[in-house]
Amino acid sequence: MRCADGALYEIKLHGKNGCMAYREGLQSGARKQLGFAFKDVSEHLPGAFIIYRAHKEDDELFYANSEFLRMAGYKDLDELFRLTQKRFRNLIREDERQQMEQSIWEQIGDGNENDYIRFHLRKADGTYLSVLDHGRIVDSQQYGRVFYVLFADREEMRLHYSEQFPQ
């Protein structure tokens, strides 16, 4: 049974569809990679991200990781949801909102699964933070079409990567 278990995990590391016979040396340290839960990854990933419904009229926020909450000054998800009415568009500065939404949907409409925008993100205290936004649209079995969006603080990027991207 232990040998079959080892072969099964080796196959899982290379995709879902496949089979193989056990052979010596399959017990690798790679097996540990399968043990990361979503919460472990989302809370320790060095990047801010959110997940929201990919719909022009109903852009409901589903999730924001702790890095996003910290960056934008929200105490917790409840405060984020309350102050934004659970809408992605309410994170975008009002005078930029229409242009940013149009840009996202034009990029997606051109057959891309990724979009790239730059805007001012509304923080919990009402101030704004200039951010870079990299979104990806995916089909979720549970929620339908959703966006996974990574955010980077433009000023932090400039400070930490100024040598890599000279002015």
Predicted regions and their residues:
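Sensory-domain cores of signal-transduction modules, predominantly PAS/LOV
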Residues: 7, 18, 47-52, 118
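PAS and related sensory helical modules
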Residues: 62, 69-90, 97-98, 102
